[in-house]
Amino acid sequence: MKIGASVVNVAWMTAQFGGYWRFRRALGRVQPTQETLLMGYLQKNAATEFGRRHGFATIRSVREYQERVPLSTYEDYIDSIQRLRSGADGILTAARVNCLEPTSGSTQAAKLIPYTRDLQSEFGRAIAPWMFDLALSAPANLGGPAYWSITPAMTQPGNSEGDDTNGTAVGFESDSAYLGGWLGWLANLTLVDCNDLRHIQDVEDFRRRTLVRLLSEGDLRLISVWHPTFLTLLLDTLVASWGELVDDVSRGLPPAGAVRASRANPARARQLARADPSRPASIWPRLTLVSCWGDGHAATLIPDLQIRLPEVRVQPKGLIATEAFVSLPFAGRHPLAICSHFFEFIDDREHARTAWELAEGESYSVVVTTGGGLYRYQLRDRITVDGFVGMTPSIRFLGKEDSVSDLCGEKLSEEWVARVLSRLLPVLAPRTTFALLAPETEGGTPQYVLYIASDEVPAPALGETLEGELALNPNYAHCVRLGQLRSVAVARVDAAAAERYLERLRQGGRRLGNIKPTALSTLTGWRAWFGMDVRPARDA
């Protein structure tokens, strides 16, 4: 056991106790907690341009706020964010904008989200109860370091990240910077130090250097990643390049630009020489927990991860966006982060509901107001309420609301496709490691193709059964009946498909850490990208 890591972890958890206790109390006081947050935003930002325009100073209730401030999307903030990027202030928040954090967008190639100290604090208010609850349920995690994934740079250096030398900085230097101040500094001491690897453009070099640092930490206790395939691809590289990686640990790696050297560790390399790369428990015997996305389409990827790490508990993350921290793992559920932001939810009748008005079993679209200056901002995330913790709704992510494929009027939504695949794949393709439904327009009449990677040959009935499920969408069935679409096809792809999928999105400007697992892509051309032929569904 690393005494240093243990001491720092205990200090870090001690610092989280206040946030944990406040969150526990708030679970039974949803309405006053949320109303206090909203009134605080209005009072603090009444003198801003946005606050004056919408009369923040005279708003006295949630209803008045909803009447005066319309629902918003990122497009409503573009002009303000461009001014913030140039160094202006007092536009959306009274608090100074410390940086603009890049994230992917549905209509924009990339969005820049304003981060203030208030917003950092709001993220911290969700992280504190999550981490403290985790320590209570698995105290062994406090005995050693953790790895929280970072991702390679989204753009070439000097292109957009951090390029505003006369205005507001773009991007944080590390994931722990989300917390800000001394908490971020303390959190950083508990982690395997990989922050400098974010400057690497080449994905293979990024994985190599990440693995060398992880392999050097024999006492690793926890791994936190976003996309489950981020970790499975690391594990694939671990097996494929085992000999070279052990040599790298023994000799060390030289620095490269902003990336520091990895020190030589021949003693650890001798330990690794006796380990089995296909059994991570022989490499990290005290690794007990992996945290990753586990709702929506990501749920279909968890079984493969669990097979690779049979001794490790996989904890699904809450719903976390760059803009807001929506829910967190706590007490075996995923309650709303009610101490972090003011939440609203749009129901199927287009009515705005507050957090204390939600009903179990119902589905909603998430709307947030945050300390970063986003007001009634539509995240376009669909959730369902699966229970309550105290009086606070526990939610589960269903899919992106604005991910709809519509070549001929069929209007297939990602949320619905994810539900279909979650029913079919465990029965007809139980060892699936990758699955993506996407439209193809080359070769005549367009069709949808299910690209699937599986350790076993999918059942012959998969294509026909999937076609029957898709035909339950009357628009899709109508397009097929009219000959506008061919029936769905099933194409088996190799194990590298997940990596090719991530690389295509990354080349399009997406950051690996921001890519959520998705059941449906609206992009065409995956057939060529995967380099394969596709047969009709009923021949699959």
Segments (PLM) and residue ranges:
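Contiguous, well-ordered alpha-helical segments that form the cores/surfaces of helical PPI scaffolds
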Residues: 98-102, 323-326
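Conserved adenylation A10 loop of the ANL superfamily
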Residues: 100-114, 234, 490
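Active-site diphosphate/adenylate-binding microenvironment
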Residues: 32, 36-100, 112, 118, ...
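A short, flexible beta-alpha/helix-coil linker loop
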Residues: 109-110, 155, 402-405
